[in-house]
Amino acid sequence: MQKPAKKALLLIVAILVSAPLIMEAYTRWSPAFSADMPAPKASTKRLILLFHGSGGKDNPAMLQLEQTLREKLTANDSEVIRYVWSPWSDGRLRASTNGLYLGEKIGAHLANQNIRELHLIGHSAGAWLPDAVCASLRKYNSEPVKVRMTFLDPIGIKGFLDFDWGSQNFGGCADFAEAIINTNDNVPGTNEPLQRAFNIDVTELPHDMNGHEWPVWYYTQTLNGMSLSMDANHFEMPRGAVAKDVTASAD
């Protein structure tokens, strides 16, 4: 092989080897940034926080879920906040790193604010915040807080190469965690059950909407006392278990 051809081949090999590593480093590096924090009322003891996905700041499905939750959660000491984390959510390659960083900040911010029950709901890339919020809150809060998590078709790709991180870790910090998944949509990293949550697979239920948003609509349509109860537990609904085509009637 002539020297120019050999050099060209070595260059191609170097690019092929280094490109994934460069992308991995890029996706996991997160500069420190400041963002507005959720501001629950001083009287709030039960808080529901919603986290949208990448590019989902004004997602109609999440807006409808927020409205429905407000209608059902009427106690004076309860509050629903849809947290907008755009623009940090908007790049899918960096959403995992940014979500973990921001979640830690939110948890620390919420510590010692009189909150006793926290329900964290994340759609798509919004799934990256709940466990970080929970871990940070438990670290800094002086009193116990009961935490429930709901993951709606969560994206679990961490960085550029780790496709299984979310399916293995999402929900681990919660007292109770559930996931509603659609396994045949075309969004990478959303098709596996979560090992640390109770899973409801809605793939085979008929619908005429975007497959990645379908779990959000399903959850909204089936909200009832059990969906919102802070007493749900993994003795009755084990972590890692999958229930297919379960439809709960709405109140």
Predicted regions and their residues:
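Serine-hydrolase catalytic-loop signature spanning alpha/beta hydrolases and amidase-signature enzymes
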Residues: 55-57
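A conserved mid-domain beta-alpha-beta active-site/ligand-binding segment of alpha/beta enzyme cores
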Residues: 198-224
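Serine-dependent carboxylesterase/thioesterase catalytic core
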Residues: 45-46, 59-60, 64-68, 78-85, ...
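Short beta-strand element of the alpha/beta-hydrolase
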Residues: 45-53
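Hydrophobic membrane-insertion alpha-helices, especially the h-region
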Residues: 7-24
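Alpha/beta-hydrolase-fold serine-hydrolase catalytic core, especially in secreted/extracellular enzymes
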Residues: 214-216, 221-251
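Short, Lys/Arg-rich N-terminal segment immediately upstream of the first membrane anchor
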Residues: 1-6
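Ser/Thr/Pro/Gly-rich low-complexity linker/stalk segments immediately outside membranes or between
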Residues: 25-45
